[in-house]
Amino acid sequence: HEETVACLDRLRAAGAEARKRELRVIRDVAEERPTVFEALAVPLATFLTDENRAVRLTTAKLFVTLAQSEPTVALPVVDALADRLADDEEFYYVRARCAEALGYLAAAHPSAATPEILADLRIGLSFDEPEVKTKLAKALSHVALGNPRRLRHHVEDLAAHLESDDELVRYHLTTAFVAVGCTYPDALVAGVDALKDRANDPNPYVRGRAAEALGLLGHSDVDVSLPEQWGRDAVESEAAADFLDMRVAFALGDRAAAAVDGVADTESIHDTTEEIVEAITTPDGDGCPNCGLGLPENGPPFCPQCGRPF
């Protein structure tokens, strides 16, 4: 451990390209062996304030990797990540990745989402850059999975963002509402109209999560009328169609649907969300799944028109 810390000290004195290159190597190691980073998170966190923004971004991505695979290792740097998220002068991609890391930490360790962090996540949905909003919504869904109680009084405010142009924002927020509704279904009353409007959402996974949330409300003591049309026949992907069908069936009163496909189950949500996000962000054919722009075969890993990462 002491030798590794000494190496990190020497790395801080190296040039920016060397720092960035070595941190990428460290991130690759973290993907394979995250447990070896125990007690190294704090020394690594000093690179979050590096003078070079590419170094800061690489470090933030490193902590996303650690927070997702071995959250206990990254837990000591919650404050450092929160400071980057709260810094309006910080490069927005750095803040986006810090929000993502904080979300993974909150899912595993709910106390990591302090009231101040939660406020930054919620407020940023209204004012931040589009790329950051996606990660803020993702982090909020993880907060809800870790402790749904934290968002039960914020449903109305968050529901206002279900009209976002970004389908990932809509997906993550409807997912957060399902997580809240699994424990506090009555809390969803504050967002019922916005959830009903998602019956016409262009994305079948968003429609499915909205149906799931409304189903939780309908299966409680709350009397709620549900949309009858959810566009089930218009879905081309078999996986997306199955996802939507089971949740619409649940919403319309089929309790058996929950047992069949893990509907209205937070563990299932946690296990399947990354796969669903990949399905949403993977372009069909040659176009961007968000704005439809034609994409070159060997172009950058993001849409040059709307900025959606792939």
Predicted feature residues:
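Acidic, polar-rich N-terminal leader regions of halophilic archaeal proteins
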Residues: 1-310
